[in-house]
Amino acid sequence: ESSLPKKVLIAKPFYYSYPPMIKYSGMETVYLKTEEGQIDLDDLRKKIIDCRAIIINSPSNPTGRVESINTLKEIESLANQYGVFVISDEVYKDLIYIQKNYSIAGPHVITINSFSKTYGMCGLRVGYLWSLDNTLIKDIIQMKTHTSMNTNILGQAMAMKATKTPRSFIREQLKVWQDRRNLLYNGLKKIDPDLWNPEGAFYMLPKIEKSAEFVWDMYRKYDVISYMGAWFGAPGRVRFSYALDKKKIEEGLFRINEYLNSRHL
């Protein structure tokens, strides 16, 4: 049993399930400052010494930002120094456009990954993790066994097939994702000139006035689905996904502009 406080560090904006999962684990969430969606290292150094674990999500859902390799190495070093667990959520790691992948490693690191994003298997919910801590892995297997039980057979079969997919296929898909990103980014930048350009994953998080009203109006009146940034710890922003073909992205941008223009009539 760790003697460290029952606190878990996450960066804002965050994936919206992190705070509830931390709460249901009997822990307290501590929030890290970010600069343009990337971790503030000075704030990290101050707060990590008072936490039991830190969750890293790079590339990020909801921002698409990627932490620099230097930042990831600093987290790796600090975690090792203070005995803090690192939960590295790397489900978008194959969807990085701007640098080589770097995976945090060490005795206190738990790496989480998924077949959902890389192979387009989102609905099948097949994931995996690894760690050097065998005791921890055994505890996780017990928890999995007595909560969600077995992973569906179809998903397992597809996952095994996916492991035989050439890496060249994954690299080729990056061009498709970049084209979609560029299309959405150029459209949304007209709404938010300071919009962060995603370096990975497939999300954007622009500032939009009356964001809650925007999300519900777009859904009810224009059949466009987006998520409120407030759900991710980013009030005043809206999360969009570009996991769509380019024609749908173009149509979505047209409807967004149509709605925003109607606001000013």
Give the residues covered by each predicted segment.
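Substrate-binding/gating loop at the entrance of the active-site cleft, primarily
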Residues: 1, 10-27
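Phosphate-binding glycine-rich loop
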Residues: 1-7, 211
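A short helix->loop->beta-strand "cap" motif at the edges of active sites that frequently abuts
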Residues: 6, 27, 81-85, 107
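Helix C-cap/helix->beta junction micro-motif
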Residues: 25, 81-82, 191, 222, ...
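Active-site phosphate-binding strand-loop segment of PLP-dependent enzymes
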Residues: 36-97
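PLP-dependent enzyme catalytic core of the Aspartate aminotransferase-like
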Residues: 42-45, 210, 217-226, 232-265
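Conserved core segment of the aminotransferase class I/II
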Residues: 110-178, 182-185, 254, 259-260
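Conserved glycine-rich beta-strand-loop-beta hairpin in the small C-terminal domain of fold type I
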Residues: 160, 176-185, 195-208, 236
